[in-house]
C-alpha cells in the first residue's frame, strides 16, 4: 500500500487496527467468562479489509 493515503482510508485503517484486539482479562472476569473471545478478530493474511 502506498505511503501517502487519503485521510478517510487512514482513519478506517486506524479503526480496524484498534478493533483487532483481544478481550481484556478484566472483562472476562467481570462477565464471568460470558465474553471470552473477540469474534471480530482479523488476521492480516487470512481476511481482507474492505477499505
UniProtKB/Swiss-Prot annotation:
Record-level Gene Ontology MF annotations: structural constituent of ribosome
Pfam families: Ribosomal_L39
Keyword annotations: Ribonucleoprotein, Ribosomal protein
Presence of the UniProt keyword Coiled coil in the record: no
InterPro entries recorded: Ribosomal_eL39, Ribosomal_eL39_CS, Ribosomal_eL39_dom_sf
GO terms under cellular component: ribonucleoprotein complex; ribosome
Single Gene Ontology BP annotation: translation
Keyword Secreted recorded: no
Similarity-based family: Belongs to the eukaryotic ribosomal protein eL39 family.
NCBIfam families: PRK01242.1 (NF002316)
This protein's name: Large ribosomal subunit protein eL39
